[in-house]
Amino acid sequence: MPSRSKSSQRWLKEHFADPFVKKAQAEGMRSRAAYKLEELLQRDRLLKPGMVVVDLGAAPGGWSQQVRKSMGASGRVVALDILEMPPLAGVEFLHGDFREQAVLSEFEAMLGDVPVDLVLSDMAPNKSGMDAVDQPRMMHLAELAMEFADTHLKVGGAFLIKLFQGVGSDDYIRELRRRYEKVTIRKPAASRKRSAEVYVLGQGKRAQIK
């Protein structure tokens, strides 16, 4: 217990000293994660006016907020989460589990015949602190996100996902290479150096899996 207490104290100290936390508070952004996405969007020029962007596991809304800010008033931002999320201007929110057919049907009804240009996933499980538990949970969420993109992302579209480096992540990236013309691994500046997280970008969705 004492070591956990020290770890918690260290995390809190780092969190409140974090320049991206301070920036998020000053700029009214919902999470520091918005700045990870901002760097990735700019570096790879992922957004164009009028795009349709889907944000999986969107709560508390930092990524959706950043997409809407970056895209201006054009296009559509559709956020999905099993958790509640307070409303965001210019963001359509669907509350539910996208593994359930009823939720998927509602999502498809929201979109109509409009193709999805970009799928985002910053999903992560609640951490137990044990890699043997956390990594399989993370990879399961990543599989669900990839399957969602397989079904709903247009040919030529892009998929950006957070992964934890560890068991299963290399195999997952190989699967992405079968699905996308170009796959890139990124570690944005706002990502804590000690964190095992990386962001993997698939661009140019193939018409068929190789």
From Swiss-Prot:
Entry GO CC: cytoplasm
Compartments, as annotated in UniProt: Cytoplasm
Residues the entry annotates as binding S-adenosyl-L-methionine: G61, W63, D81, D97, D122
Matching Pfam families: FtsJ (PF01728)
Protein task: Specifically methylates the uridine in position 2552 of 23S rRNA at the 2'-O position of the ribose in the fully assembled 50S ribosomal subunit.
Name listed for the protein in its UniProt record: Ribosomal RNA large subunit methyltransferase E
Swiss-Prot/TrEMBL keywords: Cytoplasm, Methyltransferase, rRNA processing, S-adenosyl-L-methionine, Transferase
Catalytic activity, as annotated: uridine(2552) in 23S rRNA + S-adenosyl-L-methionine = 2'-O-methyluridine(2552) in 23S rRNA + S-adenosyl-L-homocysteine + H(+)
Gene: rlmE
Species of the source: Xanthomonas campestris pv. campestris (strain ATCC 33913 / DSM 3586 / NCPPB 528 / LMG 568 / P 25)
A GO biological process held by the record: RNA methylation
InterPro entries: RNA_methyltr_RlmE, RNA_MeTrfase_FtsJ_dom, rRNA-MeTfrase_E, SAM-dependent_MTases_sf
Entry's EC annotation: 2.1.1.166
Alphabetized GO MF terms: rRNA (uridine-2'-O-)-methyltransferase activity
Active site: K162 (proton acceptor)
Main localization of the protein described in the UniProt heading: cytoplasm
Family listed: Belongs to the class I-like SAM-binding methyltransferase superfamily. RNA methyltransferase RlmE family.
